[in-house]
A protein has these predicted regions:
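Amphipathic alpha-helical assembly/interaction segments
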Residues: 1-95
């Protein structure tokens, strides 16, 4: 996968998560907070990968890529929580 393809995929992931949070997560204070955490993490994946593409050194590249990977893992956690807590049916949070 090329850097441009990964850039497009991370952006699509962020947009898909925003739509999911708006349309499929039932609104109440707890769910809203979980949806906010998920949206923050997912959009940070896309923003973080763009930062990776602008890295000025190998060390900077590795550091920024690590941050983007952490945000991706956090996104997965929030999706798992939504699924396993019964807030959203499992079919909505599976790939």
């Amino acid at each position: 996968m090329t850097p441009d393809e990964l850039r497009a995929r991370t952006k699509k992931f962020a947009v898909d998560v925003i739509r999911f949070a708006k349309e499929d997560v039932p609104g109440d204070p707890i769910n809203d907070e979980i949806a906010r955490q998920l949206t923050d993490a997912a959009t940070s994946v896309a923003a973080g990968y763009r930062a990776v593409c602008r890295a000025r050194s190998r060390a900077d590249f590795i550091y920024k890529l690590g941050n983007a990977i952490e945000e991706a893992d956090e996104s997965a956690l929030w999706l798992e929580i939504l699924c396993e807590s019964g807030i959203c049916p499992g079919h909505q949070t599976s790939p």
